[in-house]
């Protein structure tokens, strides 16, 4: 499997990936509205040149915000490899902090990031209600039956 910058992945593949996994390439979170198929990032492709993992992020003045991280095949190191690649891109730019926002229902992501050194930093109560006004396809309930209401900011200081 190959990790390559998203700018080298055909845009129609990236757009289709987000359509399938998120309902659209648009991500609405408390930090802004993003078209993920236009962001910097990395994709992991299998031998058939199909996307099996994708990370997107934006660089701010002194930090990097991960906007999306998806792995089609769980527990194979894809998410970890993509996250490490994004952290490496931050270090190359001398960025010392990387952060992300996830929702309260995303127990798997909360565990994944904390195991990799990310800390809970802030809670945005009812933030998903605001996001749902801009992107109504955001469900009320997650697959695990937890109501999707709040956003959590996780932060990691890079060495």
From Swiss-Prot:
Concerning SUPFAM superfamilies, the annotation shows: Acyl-CoA N-acyltransferases (Nat)
Q: Where is the N-acetyltransferase domain?
A: 1-139
Gene Ontology terms for molecular function: acyltransferase activity, transferring groups other than amino-acyl groups
> Sorted alphabetically, which PROSITE patterns does this protein's record hold?
GNAT
Q: Which CDD domains match?
A: NAT_SF (cd04301)
List the InterPro entries.
Acyl_CoA_acyltransferase, GNAT_dom, N-term/lysine_N-AcTrnsfr
Task: Output the Pfam families linked to this UniProt entry.
Answer: Acetyltransf_1 (PF00583)
Which superkingdom does the taxonomy of this entry point to? Bacteria
Its protein name is Uncharacterized protein YxbD
Q: Which organism is it from?
A: Bacillus subtilis (strain 168)
Supply the gene name. yxbD
């Amino acid at each position: 499997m190959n990790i390559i910058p998203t700018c080298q992945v055909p845009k129609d593949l990236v757009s289709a990936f987000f359509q399938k996994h998120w309902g659209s390439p648009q991500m609405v979170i408390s930090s802004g509205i993003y078209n993920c198929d236009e962001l910097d990032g990395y994709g992991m492709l299998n031998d058939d040149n199909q996307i099996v993992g994708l990370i997107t992020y934006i660089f701010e003045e002194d930090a990097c915000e991960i906007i999306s991280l998806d792995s089609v095949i769980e527990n194979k190191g894809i998410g970890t490899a993509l996250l490490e690649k994004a952290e490496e891109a931050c270090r190359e730019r001398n960025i010392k902090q990387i952060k992300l926002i996830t929702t309260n229902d995303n127990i798997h992501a909360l565990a994944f990031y904390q195991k990799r050194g990310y800390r809970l930093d802030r809670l945005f109560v009812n933030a998903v209600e605001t996001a749902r006004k801009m992107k109504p396809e955001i469900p009320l309930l997650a697959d695990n039956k937890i109501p999707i209401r709040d956003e959590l900011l996780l932060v990691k200081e890079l060495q």
